[in-house]
Amino acid sequence: MHTQVHTARLVHTADLDSETRQDIRQMVTGAFAGDFTETDWEHTLGGMHALIWHHGAIIAHAAVIQRRLIYRGNALRCGYVEGVAVRADWRGQRLVSALLDAVEQVMRGAYQLGALSSSARARRLYASRGWLPWHGPTSVLAPTGPVRTPDDDGTVFVLPIDISLDTSAELMCDWRAGDVW
């Protein structure tokens, strides 16, 4: 068991050299046991990366990127969390909490709300940090117009920053390739 306290370092995608970017991708893909696609990787790019290193190796990662979520007719500026991963031999060391401290700092400084799509396993962690489960229907603003995303209902969590939200209302995300939420 590792007993040190870790702090995540925030780095924008534009400031990652190619070697570090490749190391992140390799670690995240390994942490997801290969269930991390090319589009999943693309979703992590273009924003801020929270990174934790140990002896030069990346052991934990989360990204926050800008998206628009449509809520009651308003396109809200959202910090969307992607690619939360901890190397297998470092799990259980509260590294995800350090990652979330960093991405939530970005959200508080730049966005109206934070959002993410959570695995069943992680929902309790997000709720314990003040994230709210979205109870209303979810959808995506696809190229053909709004499309319901019922498979994502119950997986979305939000962190209101400077806005009040009714979590039983409809919530729509912007379009992208791959998993839209």
UniProtKB/Swiss-Prot annotation:
Residues 11-162 form the N-acetyltransferase domain. CoA binds at residues 84-86, 91-96. InterPro entries: Acyl_CoA_acyltransferase (IPR016181), GNAT_dom (IPR000182). Its EC number is 2.3.1.-. Substrate binds at residues 35, 82-83, 117, 151-152. The keyword Transferase applies. GO terms for cellular component: plasma membrane. Coiled coil: none annotated. The keyword Acyltransferase applies. One of its GO terms (molecular function) is aminoglycoside N-acetyltransferase activity. Gene3D superfamilies: 3.40.630.30. May catalyze the coenzyme A-dependent acetylation of the 2' hydroxyl or amino group of a broad spectrum of aminoglycosides and confer resistance to aminoglycosides. In vitro assays show no significant increase of resistance to aminoglycosides, possibly due to low expression in a heterologous system. Homodimer. This is Aminoglycoside 2'-N-acetyltransferase.
